[in-house]
Amino acid sequence: MKIHVAGFFAGLFGALATLFILLSFGTDYWLLASETCNSHLNSPVTSERGDILVNQVHDPNSEAPNITFHHEGFFWRCTFDDVMNDGNLWKFWFENQPHVRVCKPAYLLPFPFPDQSYNTTSYQTAIIYRGFWSVSMLVGVAAVVAGGFIIICAAPFASHRLYKAGGGLYLISGFFVLVVTAMYVIWIDVLDVISLYTEYQKLNKCADFELNKTYGLSFMFAPVGVFFCFLSGLLFLVIGRTVHHQYN
């Protein structure tokens, strides 16, 4: 009876872990940022060959200052111009839809590096760092999906090996997603890339340039998924060990 209860909760936690990790992986809101430059209030969003443009109607009569917004995730880094009257970045994202978006692939190019002209050395470093980040994310997602399939196969046959393999994959997934989360925090808050980017923009764009940033829902899904990964992984390992003792 106890093993069935443990199996139920392990399966529930495993399903939640898979859900949160896939949401974190598939949504492009790891970072929310806004740039304000009063000397270029009406500058248009630039695009390059291959960019994806999403066009809607823009209100030309708005008197509020124009702000450039950014959001990024594993797949895309998007930019658009809009107005924000109350200064609440979270409220803006939940209550407003972007009017013009320019989305670029973000696999190897994290915010805030816009192009190679910014800094060649930093640009290459960003690509390498982002590469490790992307690989860790892919390993974490692959491990949690594989672990889920193995557990589904283990349940009908009561195979202790499959339970242990599934639990191990959940633990591996939790570890790599934890690494992904830590690397992202280090990139945004520990390294000086944000401050260097702000100084660069003040020197080359406008003296009163301001950058506001906050973590998005995709980022917040990751540690929740990590917690459930570790919890379900440990439970599946215990279940596998118990099943092994019962049949041997």
From Swiss-Prot:
Gene that this sequence comes from: tmem182a
UniProt-listed InterPro entries: PMP22/EMP/MP20/Claudin, TMEM182
Purpose of the protein: May negatively regulate myogenesis and skeletal muscle regeneration.
Residues in the signal sequence: 1-26
Positions in the Extracellular compartment: 27-136, 189-218
Species this chain originates from: Danio rerio
Record's protein name: Transmembrane protein 182
Ranges in a coiled coil: none
Protein's membrane topology: Multi-pass membrane protein
Membrane spanning residue stretches: 137-157, 168-188, 219-239
